[in-house]
């Protein structure tokens, strides 16, 4: 059985990933403990979205309300589905710049350590699975602010003659620029994912 595992499954990108694969007949295992409510208050709760996914997809969506930093609980999920896990889509994160500044340990452990927990379980239990990490433009710090922008009718665009006109990729540097604490924790996670790919395939 092909299993898709999605962290942050009740959030915006995670829930769209769940819908995409459930609509195509896959079984999706979702991990989301609604930390948005903790970070931003009751109005930011994703419980409604989780409940909608459960109602909409029934047995095709299996939800686990687990913190991605909980190594034992995450390992138990990975061991339950073992090599049936074909794809991991990691969208879970601590997304608040204000929270990162007020509690840098929480920010770093969710974004970097939580990513490491998922990577290591993938390596140990389902090494053939594909791992997709959803990062953020904040890993580039303030570097994008110095690109040549052209004012359009509705927004600013990068000049068509620039190499990043069709999108910014990993060739943009992340050093020697200003980062937020949130951006720094996501850089750590980003580099972990890249290095796991280099070391372990």
Residue ranges and their predicted role:
Residues 1-201:
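N-terminal Rossmann-like NAD(P)+-binding domain of SDR-like oxidoreductases, especially those catalyzing
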